[in-house]
Amino acid sequence: MVITNPIVYGKFIKRINRFEAYVELNSGEKTLVHVPNTGRCKEIFVPGAEVILEVRDRQGRKTPYELAFAYKGKRLISIDSQVPNKVVLESIKMGLIEEFKGYDIVEKEKTFGNSKFDIKLTKGKEICYVEVKGVTLEVEGVAKFPDAPTERGRKHLKELIKVKKEGMRAAVIFLIQMDDIKYFTPNDEQDPEFGKFLREAVGKGVEAYAYTCDVGENYVFLKDRVEVVL
């Protein structure tokens, strides 16, 4: 996924709510920016952190600036919570994910039961539902999800178990929005119930995968599969 809009650089000042923050541009101007991620991201959004903003100057926006990337030390992290779905969908269509090659129909945002899953794959009578979770939390080289309790995430896992029970394929992909990660594990400290449901789901045949990303200042591409440690 490549950002084609202009980008500008700045330093993070403070987050004022789930969707907005203040950033000082390299020009010295202090401005409001939209934060396209409702997660806490406390270890990323620290005063003085270098950030990259995408300029989306469309009518009706409160601010033209979208907080797209942030540096955590030397590690560049993609912030936008819409990116993981785009990257995974693009990668499946291009045949880059070995586990999901060979499907004839690739659809996004399809409903099953009480949930809407990110991707539905079809090959003849074979159906696979895929849920994508973006991961921005890194602790000592280990990626963790979630960074805050997620009722929605727990619900998706329960529904994936139902998909599997009905004889279809069910999978969750944790798309780690950065590189140089040792492995992925559920964040039991923040949401022990999510970890419990993930382990239960995998035990009942739901597939769990984690991939890192090659992240640049205007692009995010799928990179390497890493181990899911439960």
UniProtKB/Swiss-Prot annotation:
Quote the InterPro entries the UniProt record gives: SfsA, SfsA_C, SfsA_N
Family as reported in the entry's similarity comment: Belongs to the SfsA family.
State the organism named in the record: Thermoanaerobacter pseudethanolicus (strain ATCC 33223 / 39E)
Give TM segment ranges.
Answer: none
Q: Check the record and name the PANTHER family matching this protein.
A: SUGAR FERMENTATION STIMULATION PROTEIN A
Gene Ontology MF, one: DNA binding
Q: What span is annotated as the signal peptide, if there is one?
A: none
Q: What is the lineage of its organism?
A: Bacteria, Bacillati, Bacillota, Clostridia, Thermoanaerobacterales
| Record Pfam families | SfsA (PF03749), SfsA_N (PF17746)
Name used for this protein in its record: Sugar fermentation stimulation protein homolog
